Amino acid sequence: GGALVAQGGSTELVHPDQAEVGFAYDGFNRWLLSADYAWIGWARFHQLDIHFSNPALGTVTNIEDYNNSSAIRLGAQYTAHNNWQWRVGFAGVAAAAPPQTVTPILPDQDRSNYTVGLGIPLTTGLTLDAAYAYVWNPGRRGRLANPTSPSISGSTLNDGVYTLFANIISISLKASF
């Protein structure tokens, strides 16, 4: 070890292709139903090269080998007689990172989001929206350290378990004019 020294470096990250399709249907009395599907082309993310400006350090290559991922989202909204809008939703998201690249820096994993919400019209053009989301996943094994040599597979270092639970509360005031 020794003192950390400031140094320059560069990398390039190409964002994945994405395709989404969705629809909403309001043909039922007071109901709006919606659904969408997203595909994200993460399979093109094979490695991340970090080029250091100090020639002695050279380039560090992190192997990623991501998979394509997808998400499905479903929602419903009911407008009551007092024009309050009651909402419920679900989103399921598939992880892109393979087990050998899951780390504390990016503990990517499959997850489910469950939501409820309420829209209250206060005056003409002014609405108060409140929502709650619960994010859950089943947990996922991942590594705590990088392989120390190319002959060590990242998946053999999967000695950590990552879980995620989140409670998200949102309140907003919407003005329409």
What label would you give each PLM region?
Residues 1-177:
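Outer-membrane beta-barrel porins/channels
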